[in-house]
Amino acid sequence: MARLQQFYKETIVSDLVKQFGYKSVMEVPRITKITLNMGVGEAVADKKVLENAVGDMQKIAGQKPVTTKARKSIAGFKIRDGYPIGCMVTLRGPRMFEFLDRLVTIALPRVRDFRGISGKGFDGQGNYNMGVKEQIIFPEIEYDKIDALRGMNISITTTAKTDAEAKALLVAFKFPFKN
Protein backbone atom coordinates (compact mmCIF):
# COMPACT_ATOMS: atom_id res chain seq x y z
CA MET A 1 0.00 0.00 0.00
CA ALA A 2 1.29 3.46 -0.93
CA ARG A 3 2.40 5.78 1.87
CA LEU A 4 -0.23 8.44 1.13
CA GLN A 5 -2.98 5.84 0.77
CA GLN A 6 -2.24 4.57 4.27
CA PHE A 7 -2.05 8.16 5.57
CA TYR A 8 -5.47 8.84 4.00
CA LYS A 9 -7.10 5.82 5.62
CA GLU A 10 -5.53 6.30 9.05
CA THR A 11 -5.64 10.07 9.60
CA ILE A 12 -7.28 12.11 6.83
CA VAL A 13 -10.63 10.27 6.95
CA SER A 14 -11.07 10.82 10.69
CA ASP A 15 -9.95 14.47 10.44
CA LEU A 16 -12.44 15.23 7.65
CA VAL A 17 -15.29 13.45 9.50
CA LYS A 18 -14.63 15.75 12.49
CA GLN A 19 -14.26 18.85 10.30
CA PHE A 20 -17.41 18.40 8.15
CA GLY A 21 -19.53 16.19 10.45
CA TYR A 22 -20.16 13.32 8.02
CA LYS A 23 -22.47 10.58 9.28
CA SER A 24 -20.60 7.81 7.45
CA VAL A 25 -16.94 7.36 6.49
CA MET A 26 -18.12 6.63 2.93
CA GLU A 27 -19.22 10.28 2.63
CA VAL A 28 -15.64 11.47 3.11
CA PRO A 29 -14.27 12.81 -0.19
CA ARG A 30 -11.46 10.85 -1.81
CA ILE A 31 -9.30 11.21 -4.89
CA THR A 32 -10.65 8.95 -7.64
CA LYS A 33 -8.11 9.64 -10.41
CA ILE A 34 -5.32 11.91 -11.58
CA THR A 35 -5.11 12.73 -15.28
CA LEU A 36 -1.90 14.06 -16.84
CA ASN A 37 -2.32 15.73 -20.22
CA MET A 38 0.43 17.08 -22.47
CA GLY A 39 -0.50 18.98 -25.63
CA VAL A 40 2.32 18.90 -28.16
CA GLY A 41 1.49 21.35 -30.94
CA GLU A 42 4.91 20.94 -32.58
CA ALA A 43 4.04 17.29 -33.32
CA VAL A 44 2.35 18.45 -36.55
CA ALA A 45 5.71 19.24 -38.16
CA ASP A 46 7.83 16.54 -36.52
CA LYS A 47 6.57 13.16 -35.26
CA LYS A 48 9.76 12.65 -33.22
CA VAL A 49 8.64 15.43 -30.83
CA LEU A 50 5.54 13.46 -29.87
CA GLU A 51 7.60 10.30 -29.29
CA ASN A 52 9.87 12.23 -26.90
CA ALA A 53 6.82 13.66 -25.09
CA VAL A 54 5.33 10.17 -24.73
CA GLY A 55 8.66 8.90 -23.34
CA ASP A 56 8.83 11.74 -20.79
CA MET A 57 5.22 11.18 -19.73
CA GLN A 58 5.84 7.44 -19.35
CA LYS A 59 8.82 8.10 -17.04
CA ILE A 60 6.80 10.57 -14.95
CA ALA A 61 3.60 8.53 -14.63
CA GLY A 62 5.05 5.02 -14.59
CA GLN A 63 2.59 3.80 -17.19
CA LYS A 64 2.26 4.12 -20.97
CA PRO A 65 0.31 7.20 -22.11
CA VAL A 66 -2.23 7.17 -24.92
CA THR A 67 -1.73 9.60 -27.82
CA THR A 68 -4.54 12.10 -28.30
CA LYS A 69 -5.69 12.99 -31.79
CA ALA A 70 -7.11 16.23 -33.19
CA ARG A 71 -10.92 16.22 -33.18
CA LYS A 72 -11.31 18.63 -36.06
CA SER A 73 -9.20 20.23 -38.77
CA ILE A 74 -7.87 23.76 -38.18
CA ALA A 75 -6.19 25.25 -41.25
CA GLY A 76 -4.55 28.09 -39.30
CA PHE A 77 -2.63 25.60 -37.17
CA LYS A 78 -2.03 23.19 -40.10
CA ILE A 79 -3.86 20.43 -38.22
CA ARG A 80 -6.07 17.84 -39.89
CA ASP A 81 -8.69 15.68 -38.22
CA GLY A 82 -7.07 12.60 -36.66
CA TYR A 83 -3.52 14.00 -36.39
CA PRO A 84 -1.75 12.92 -33.17
CA ILE A 85 -1.20 16.17 -31.23
CA GLY A 86 -0.63 15.16 -27.61
CA CYS A 87 -0.65 12.43 -25.00
CA MET A 88 -2.45 11.73 -21.76
CA VAL A 89 -2.42 9.19 -18.96
CA THR A 90 -4.99 8.42 -16.25
CA LEU A 91 -3.67 7.19 -12.90
CA ARG A 92 -5.82 5.29 -10.41
CA GLY A 93 -5.18 3.23 -7.28
CA PRO A 94 -1.68 2.79 -5.83
CA ARG A 95 0.05 4.41 -8.84
CA MET A 96 -2.08 7.50 -8.33
CA PHE A 97 -1.03 7.79 -4.68
CA GLU A 98 2.64 7.23 -5.55
CA PHE A 99 2.47 10.00 -8.18
CA LEU A 100 0.70 12.33 -5.73
CA ASP A 101 3.41 11.66 -3.14
CA ARG A 102 6.19 12.50 -5.63
CA LEU A 103 4.31 15.58 -6.86
CA VAL A 104 3.81 17.10 -3.40
CA THR A 105 7.10 16.13 -1.72
CA ILE A 106 9.63 16.26 -4.58
CA ALA A 107 8.37 17.89 -7.79
CA LEU A 108 6.51 21.01 -6.61
CA PRO A 109 9.31 22.22 -4.29
CA ARG A 110 11.69 21.98 -7.29
CA VAL A 111 9.70 24.57 -9.29
CA ARG A 112 11.65 27.80 -9.76
CA ASP A 113 10.43 30.69 -7.54
CA PHE A 114 7.84 28.41 -5.92
CA ARG A 115 5.52 30.18 -3.48
CA GLY A 116 2.70 27.65 -3.39
CA ILE A 117 0.04 26.51 -5.84
CA SER A 118 -2.98 28.63 -6.69
CA GLY A 119 -6.25 28.02 -4.89
CA LYS A 120 -8.21 29.09 -7.98
CA GLY A 121 -7.87 25.79 -9.85
CA PHE A 122 -11.11 24.29 -8.47
CA ASP A 123 -13.93 23.80 -10.98
CA GLY A 124 -17.01 24.06 -8.74
CA GLN A 125 -17.60 20.29 -8.57
CA GLY A 126 -14.69 19.54 -6.23
CA ASN A 127 -12.02 18.79 -8.83
CA TYR A 128 -8.65 20.55 -9.01
CA ASN A 129 -6.64 21.46 -12.11
CA MET A 130 -3.12 22.80 -12.23
CA GLY A 131 -0.46 23.36 -14.84
CA VAL A 132 3.24 22.58 -14.73
CA LYS A 133 5.42 24.68 -17.04
CA GLU A 134 8.36 22.30 -17.36
CA GLN A 135 8.71 18.54 -17.02
CA ILE A 136 12.21 18.71 -15.49
CA ILE A 137 10.78 19.26 -11.99
CA PHE A 138 10.20 15.51 -11.84
CA PRO A 139 13.29 13.56 -10.73
CA GLU A 140 12.67 10.82 -13.35
CA ILE A 141 13.50 13.22 -16.19
CA GLU A 142 17.22 13.62 -16.84
CA TYR A 143 18.07 17.22 -17.70
CA ASP A 144 20.74 16.26 -20.27
CA LYS A 145 18.44 13.99 -22.27
CA ILE A 146 15.50 16.33 -22.94
CA ASP A 147 15.03 18.04 -26.30
CA ALA A 148 12.61 20.78 -25.19
CA LEU A 149 10.84 22.02 -22.06
CA ARG A 150 7.23 20.88 -22.11
CA GLY A 151 4.46 21.63 -19.68
CA MET A 152 1.45 19.55 -18.74
CA ASN A 153 -1.97 19.79 -17.14
CA ILE A 154 -2.62 17.80 -13.98
CA SER A 155 -6.30 17.16 -13.15
CA ILE A 156 -7.15 15.72 -9.75
CA THR A 157 -10.68 14.29 -9.72
CA THR A 158 -12.29 13.86 -6.29
CA THR A 159 -15.65 12.70 -4.95
CA ALA A 160 -16.04 15.99 -3.03
CA LYS A 161 -19.31 17.83 -3.65
CA THR A 162 -17.97 21.34 -3.02
CA ASP A 163 -14.71 23.15 -3.60
CA ALA A 164 -14.30 23.70 0.16
CA GLU A 165 -14.39 19.95 0.81
CA ALA A 166 -11.95 19.30 -2.05
CA LYS A 167 -9.55 21.96 -0.77
CA ALA A 168 -9.72 20.51 2.76
CA LEU A 169 -8.90 17.08 1.29
CA LEU A 170 -5.90 18.39 -0.68
CA VAL A 171 -4.65 20.44 2.29
CA ALA A 172 -4.83 17.24 4.36
CA PHE A 173 -2.61 15.63 1.70
CA LYS A 174 -0.09 18.46 2.42
CA PHE A 175 -0.68 20.37 -0.84
CA PRO A 176 1.28 23.64 -0.60
CA PHE A 177 -1.45 26.20 -1.38
CA LYS A 178 -0.63 29.93 -1.35
CA ASN A 179 -1.54 31.88 1.86
Curated annotation (Swiss-Prot):
Task: Write one Pfam family the protein is assigned to.
Answer: Ribosomal_L5_C
The species this protein belongs to is Dechloromonas aromatica (strain RCB)
NCBIfam families attached here? PRK00010.1 (NF000585)
Q: Does the keyword Metal-binding apply?
A: no
What top-level branch of life does the organism fall under?
A: Bacteria
Q: Name one GO cellular component term.
A: ribonucleoprotein complex
Q: Which GO terms describe its molecular function?
A: rRNA binding; structural constituent of ribosome; tRNA binding
The protein here is known as: Large ribosomal subunit protein uL5
GO biological process assignments: translation
Q: Which UniProt keywords apply?
A: Ribonucleoprotein, Ribosomal protein, RNA-binding, rRNA-binding, tRNA-binding
* Family under the similarity heading: Belongs to the universal ribosomal protein uL5 family.
User: What does this protein's UniProt record list under function?
Assistant: This is one of the proteins that bind and probably mediate the attachment of the 5S RNA into the large ribosomal subunit, where it forms part of the central protuberance. In the 70S ribosome it contacts protein S13 of the 30S subunit (bridge B1b), connecting the 2 subunits; this bridge is implicated in subunit movement. Contacts the P site tRNA; the 5S rRNA and some of its associated proteins might help stabilize positioning of ribosome-bound tRNAs.
Q: Subunit details for this protein?
A: Part of the 50S ribosomal subunit; part of the 5S rRNA/L5/L18/L25 subcomplex. Contacts the 5S rRNA and the P site tRNA. Forms a bridge to the 30S subunit in the 70S ribosome.
